[in-house]
Amino acid sequence: MLKTIKIFSDGSCLGNPGPGGYSFIIQHLEYENISSSGFYLTTNNRMELMGIIVATESLKQPCCITISTDSQYVQKGILYWIKNWKTKGWKTSRKTYVKNVDLWLRLEKSLNLHQVTWKWIKSHSGNKKNEQCDHLARESAKFPTLKDFGYIL
């Protein structure tokens, strides 16, 4: 039987592009893992993706995961858009190149091991775990320690 895991995640960027951070909370039964990191120069969307990627990459065995995010970009991207992007050589419907391909590929790979359900949460709607992730992501953006090597101006 698969472990049932809840993941809450959020990303933040001060300036967009600018310093950014992500945070996630992983819950399993009474266990809770909270993590966050800050980057010197990145974007909000990259941080939204990174939070979920780092959380799911930390799971070493197949799990049944519910991922809660306030990012429609991430949720719609992985559920609806990615198949067309890949078919069209990573181009959008407007024939421009998809941004953050490096992270979309990492996200897709990190999810392959798991059974995943996506739950969209409206930003700042009072969901305590989402609010906690939002706060930690913003704080991490204020004190960056990492370089986002995949970010290209």
Swiss-Prot record:
One of its GO terms (biological process) is DNA replication, removal of RNA primer. Residues 1-142 form the RNase H type-1 domain. Its main location: cytoplasm. Mg(2+) 2 binds at residues 10, 134. Mg(2+) 1 binds at residues 10, 48, 70. Keywords: Cytoplasm, Endonuclease, Hydrolase, Magnesium, Metal-binding, Nuclease. The keyword Secreted does not apply. It is found in: Cytoplasm. Endonuclease that specifically degrades the RNA of RNA-DNA hybrids. This is Ribonuclease H.
